[in-house]
From Swiss-Prot:
Name of the protein in question: Cysteine--tRNA ligase
Main localization, broad class: cytoplasm
HAMAP family: Cys_tRNA_synth
Residue sites binding Zn(2+) per the record: C51, C232, H257, E261
Reactions performed catalytically: tRNA(Cys) + L-cysteine + ATP = L-cysteinyl-tRNA(Cys) + AMP + diphosphate
Pfam families: DALR_2, tRNA-synt_1e
Record GO cellular component, one term: cytosol
GO biological process annotation, one example: cysteinyl-tRNA aminoacylation
Enzyme kind, highest EC tier: ligase
Localisation: Cytoplasm
Quaternary structure note: Monomer.
Length: 505
C-alpha cells in the first residue's frame, strides 16, 4: 500500500479565503426543498446528527457513500472555521441483529462488537475521520424511556394490551411534513397489515414488549426494548439538545424513519427538531437501489479487493451527494483514471522540484494574486451544497496546469510557479482527503493492479499521458517502464508527429 507523504499545511491565503466564505455556504434542505443560505443556531458552532449503521453485517457501498458524504461535509464546515459536533449513532439492538445472532448461534454483544470494529476499519480505509460522538442505542435506554414517558404524558403515546407502547400519529399535526405525505392520503392507500393493538395502522412502536430469549430492559410498561425510531430521537437530543443544525442520512430514511423522529422529538420538546435536513442519494445496481434486502449489494471489503480505497472515495465524490449513482466496475475504473490524473501531476512536480510538494517550505509566500482563480472556484463549488464533482473539476484544471508547468520548468520563475500550483493542488485535494499519498508509490501500486486485468481505454490513455509527461521531464526510465507494461498487456504504441496512437494487438 502507498505510504502517506507529509500532508501540507493549508496555505495562509487559502485559510483566509475559507474564513471569509462562511456566509456564502448554501445547503439544500429536504424539508423546504430549497437550497438556502446556512445560518447556524449558535454563531461559530454546528451540531450535526447522522443516522448510522445497524451492525449485523459488513457495510456495503451504499453505507460507504453516506460515510464519505458526511465526512466531507464535516471537513468542509471545519475548514470554514466552524466548531463542529458531528454525531453518528450505532444501532446495536434491533430485530435484524437478534435474528442474525440466533442464526449464527452467537451472543448479540459479540456480533455487534465484531461488526462495529469492521465498520470502523472500513471507514478508516475510506479516509473518513471518526465522528465526534458515536452513541450506541444500548447505552442510552434511560433517555429513550424518559422520552417515551414524556410522550405518554402529553398524550402522544399509548400502551397497548400486548405490552407494546405506540406513538399516536393522529396527535401530531405536522406528520408527513418532511416527506410531503399527508396522513389521510397514506391511510386512503394503505396496505398496512391490520394490527388490532394499534389505534391507527400508521402508529409506530416506541417500546416493544419482551419476548422469550431476547434482550430486555425494565420499564414502567414492563420488560422490553426500544423501537428503532425512538433511538435516534433520544440520542440526538442527548448529544445535541432539543434543536440542532443538520440532520443527515440516506434518502431511504426520509420516510418513515426521519418523519417519525420529527413527530417524536417535536411532540416531546415543543422545539423544531433539526433546522436542515440532508439526504444522500441511492447507489443503484442495474437500475435498482443497492440494499441488503434486495441482495444486490457489494460490501466495502469486497470492492476494496479490486480497487484502492481512495479510488472508491473518489468514485463517491465524483457525483453530487444528492444524486443517484450507478455502481459498476466501469464506473470504478473511470474514477481510478481520474484520481490517477491528480497523482500524475503531483509526481511530475516532484520529479522537477526534487522534493515532495507537500513539504514545500515556501508555502507562506504563496498569495492569492499568484495562485489564480482555482481556490476561489473550489470554494464556490463546495459552498454550493457541497458540490464535490465541480470541486474535482477544479482539481483537474489545476492538475493540467501543473503538468504544463512541469514540462516547461527550465527556469527559476517557472519552477517557483510550479511549486506554488502543486502545493495548491495538494492542499485543495486534501480538503476532500484525496491526493495525500506518496504519488510515486500510489502510481506504482496501481500499475501492478491494472496489469492483473484488461485495461480500459481510460486507463490506457492515462498511462500514455504519464509516459509523455515522463519523457518531457526526462524521466526516460519511467517512460520505458510504462511502454513495456502496455506492450505486455497487448497494447501497441506508435509515436508520431501528431502524438501517440495505440491499438490492442
Amino acid at each position: 500500500m502507498s505510504s502517506p507523504a507529509k500532508i501540507a499545511q493549508t496555505p495562509e491565503f487559502l485559510s483566509k479565503q475559507l474564513l471569509q466564505q462562511q456566509a456564502a455556504l448554501k445547503i439544500y434542505d429536504s424539508m423546504t426543498t430549497n437550497k438556502r443560505s446556512f445560518e447556524p443556531l449558535q454563531a461559530g458552532k454546528i451540531g450535526m446528527y447522522v443516522c448510522g449503521m445497524t451492525v449485523y453485517d459488513y457495510c456495503h457501498i451504499g453505507h460507504a457513500r453516506v460515510m464519505v458524504a458526511f465526512d466531507v461535509v464535516s471537513r468542509w464546515l471545519r475548514h470554514l472555521g466552524y466548531e463542529v459536533n458531528y454525531v453518528r449513532n450505532i444501532t446495536d439492538i434491533d430485530d435484524k441483529i437478534i435474528a442474525r445472532a440466533n442464526e449464527n448461534g452467537e451472543p448479540i454483544g459479540e456480533l455487534t462488537h465484531r461488526f462495529i470494529k469492521a465498520m470502523h476499519e472500513d471507514a478508516a480505509a475510506l479516509g473518513c475521520e471518526n465522528p465526534d460522538a458515536e452513541p450506541r442505542a444500548t447505552e442510552h435506554i434511560d433517555e429513550m424511556l424518559d422520552m417515551i414517558g414524556t410522550l405518554e404524558q402529553k398524550q402522544h403515546a399509548y400502551a397497548a394490551s400486548n405490552g407494546d407502547v405506540y406513538y399516536a400519529v393522529d396527535t401530531f399535526e405536522g406528520y408527513g411534513k418532511l416527506s410531503k405525505r399527508k396522513l389521510e392520503d397514506l391511510q386512503a392507500g394503505s396496505r398496512v397489515d391490520v394490527d388490532t393493538d394499534k389505534k391507527n395502522p400508521f402508529d409506530f412502536v416506541l417500546w416493544k414488549a419482551a419476548k422469550a430469549g431476547e434482550p430486555q430492559w425494565a420499564s414502567s410498561w414492563g420488560g422490553g426494548r426500544p423501537g428503532w425510531h425512538i433511538e435516534c430521537s433520544a440520542m440526538s437530543t442527548k448529544c445535541l439538545g432539543n434543536s440542532f443544525d443538520i440532520h443527515g442520512g440516506g434518502h431511504d430514511l426520509q420516510f418513515p424513519h426521519h418523519e417519525n423522529e420529527i413527530a417524536q422529538s417535536e411532540a416531546a420538546t415543543g422545539c423544531t427538531y433539526a433546522h436542515n435536513w440532508m439526504h444522500v442519494g441511492f447507489i443503484n445496481v442495474d437500475g435498482e437501489k443497492m440494499s441488503k434486502s434486495l441482495g444486490n449489494f457489494f460490501t466495502i471489503r469486497e470492492v476494496m479487493q479490486k480497487f484502492h480505497p481512495e479510488t472508491i472515495r473518489f468514485f463517491i465524490l465524483s457525483s453530487h451527494y444528492r444524486s443517484q449513482v450507478n455502481f459498476s466496475d466501469a464506473a470504478l475504473k473511470e474514477a481510478h483514471s481520474g484520481l490517477t490524473r491528480i497523482y500524475q501531476a503531483l509526481k511530475a512536480a516532484d520529479a522537477v522540484l526534487n522534493t515532495s510538494v507537500s513539504a514545500a517550505e515556501s508555502i507562506e509566500s504563496i498569495n492569492a494574486e499568484h495562485a489564480g482563480t482555482h481556490s476561489a472556484d473550489f470554494i464556490a463549488a463546495m459552498n454550493d451544497d457541497f458540490n464535490t464533482p465541480q470541486a474535482i473539476s477544479v482539481l483537474f484544471s489545476l492538475a493540467k496546469e501543473v503538468n504544463k508547468l512541469a514540462r516547461d520548468a527550465d527556469d527559476a520563475d517557472t519552477q517557483a510557479q510550479l511549486q506554488l500550483q502543486a502545493v495548491q493542488l495538494r492542499a485543495l485535494a486534501g480538503i476532500l482527503n484525496i491526493g495525500q499519498l506518496n504519488p510515486a508509490e500510489f502510481l506504482q501500486a496501481q500499475i501492478g493492479e491494472v496489469a492483473e486485468d484488461q485495461m480500459s481505454d481510460e486507463q490506457i490513455e492515462a498511462l500514455i499521458q504519464e509516459r509523455l509527461d515522463s519523457k518531457a521531464n526526462k524521466n526516460f526510465a519511467r517512460a520505458d517502464e510504462i511502454r513495456d507494461l502496455l506492450q505486455n498487456s497487448g497494447i501497441e504504441l506508435e509515436d508520431g508527429k501528431l502524438g501517440t496512437t495505440w491499438r490492442r494487438t
